[in-house]
Every structure is written in structure tokens, then in C-alpha cells.
Amino acid sequence: PGSSKAQLVLPDGRRVDLEVDRGCQQLKGENFVNDGKQLVYHEQENGKRIQWHTLSVPRGGEYKLVLADGTRVWLNAASELMYPDHFSADQRKVVLKGEAYFEVTKDVKRPFSVVLGDMEVKVLGTSFNVSA
């Protein structure tokens, strides 16, 4: 794999260069850890307000993301994924521009949805590649 060149945009607009700032991403109030190769989120207690994050990978890059429910996402070059820092009790939804491979953690009570423009892919737990 090549270099990641990925950037994370936090809800307050801060941009984190994930390749440069690896190993130190236990930011105050955030529930993720970055090791320079992947970004891993952890479940939070119910009732905490959902914050939307955006992972952006430019041309020539790639990055792996583990969402709070354990779903693994490989985000390809020239792609962007908007996702919550944790999921609600009844649904799991992300928004994709570009291409990604998903290994979705099975949860029959909370469908997993990928929104791609005016299209939506909804699954309960499976692996698939999608490009928009």
C-alpha cells in the first residue's frame, strides 16, 4: 500500500493529517485512535450527542477505518466518507463520495446504510465494494 495522505475533518472544522499526527489522536472528547494506517472508533454510552466526522483521501492515497460498531471500511483514493462518531440505537448510516470496501458488522436490529448521492444501499451485515 502507498502512503495514506488521509485527512480527518472534525465537527468543529479542525483538520487532522492522519499520516503526520499518528499515535497521538486520543483528542479530548473524541472516541478514536489513529496509528497512521487506520482510524479506530470505540462505542460510546447511549445518550451522548452524535458528532459527524469526515474522512477524506486524496488521489494516490488510501485509508482503513473501523467504525464504532466494528464495521471495517477501506476508503479508496479520491474518496470521502462522512460518518457519525457512534451510531444511534436504531440505525447505522454513512455517506460516501467515491469508492470504498465495507465489511459490515451484523446487527439485525440496526440496518447499515451507505448513502451515495440519491441512492442508498442498506444491509444487515455483509461485505461489499461500492463506488459512486
What name fits each language-model region?
Residues 1-132:
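Short acidic/polar, Gly/Pro-enriched loop/turn segments located at secondary-structure boundaries
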